[in-house]
Amino acid sequence: MADAALARSVPTAVAAPAHIVDVLIEERAPKLSRSAAWPVVRPLLYALLGYGKARAMADAIAPMGGKAALDFVSDLLAIKVDVSGLQHLPRKGRLVIVGNHPTGIADGVAVYDALKAVRPDIIFYANSDAHRVCAGFDETLIPVEWVAAKRTRDRTRLTLTMTREVLEAERALMVFPAGKLARRDAHGVLTDPTWMPTAISVAVKYRAPIVPVHVEGPWATLFHLFDRFSGELRDITLFHELLNKSGQRFRITIGKPIPPDRLDPDAAVASAAIKTYVERTLPFDPDRPFV
């Protein structure tokens, strides 16, 4: 009896919650992480993908405000940015900035570094998972769920509400309308997937000029290698393809503002036209306006 009472009095150990980096990796690789091979494969993948560095970064920014967290990541990466066309960027007033997406999260860091001196009020559309790493990102990132199957009415309402507040406050909003990394097309040219028309619709609704931006950065080697044979392996490279850009060079080209009333009334058509301009004209002739 005494032994039984003693056993009942001993608190049951509670497992510590999984680290957010582990959670995000396993969510992106559900089949692999539930397979019998995962305990064997995981240490190898984590070593390859720089898991320790990703975890350290996540722990560092978790308690920070959004601006401090973004500056921390910017300082951590110390990306070298060559900027052209900065004179085209309006210094005040509402803007919707749209750009291609060649390398991953580092594209946003490079754009931030390039534009923050002129537009310190810049805020980004970003995958909603970023806020799970750092809740303070509300200051600098608007959470967006790019995967249609994961969208909910509440998440969409939050995105739209924050968008309205940002543009009514005359801030600059940066969007990567592809929502996914670029791939090589049939001709071997790095090309974004079809751009979602959201950014154009928002610009038209709030009468905000659109500033096109072209981003050129280092090749995302592991992302494209894994993309050939496994979508899950490809998707868990997100932290690796951010942190391995440390000290690397990006080129940012800024085009002339596009008045929203000059666009095709069909947002999808207008979005496709701007995408073509950003990818095929802007990096070679930044002074040539979109027509």
Show which residues each predicted segment covers.
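Non-catalytic C-terminal accessory region of glycerolipid acyltransferases
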Residues: 2-9, 13, 21, 156-291
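Membrane-anchoring hydrophobic helices of lipid-metabolizing enzymes
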Residues: 2-98, 108-110, 117-121, 289-291
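Generic beta-strand structural signal
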Residues: 95, 120-123, 140, 163, ...
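Short, charged beta->alpha transition segments
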Residues: 80-86, 128-130, 159-166
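Short, flexible loop segments at the rims of nucleotide/cofactor-binding pockets, characterized by
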Residues: 59, 72-78, 101, 149-154, ...
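Short, conserved catalytic or adaptor-binding loops enriched in Gly and charged residues
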Residues: 71-75, 133, 242-245
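Catalytic core of membrane glycerolipid acyltransferases/transacylases, capturing the structured
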Residues: 40, 48-52, 96-152
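Residue-level detector of flexible, active-site-proximal loop/helix-junction positions
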Residues: 88, 129-131, 148, 217, ...
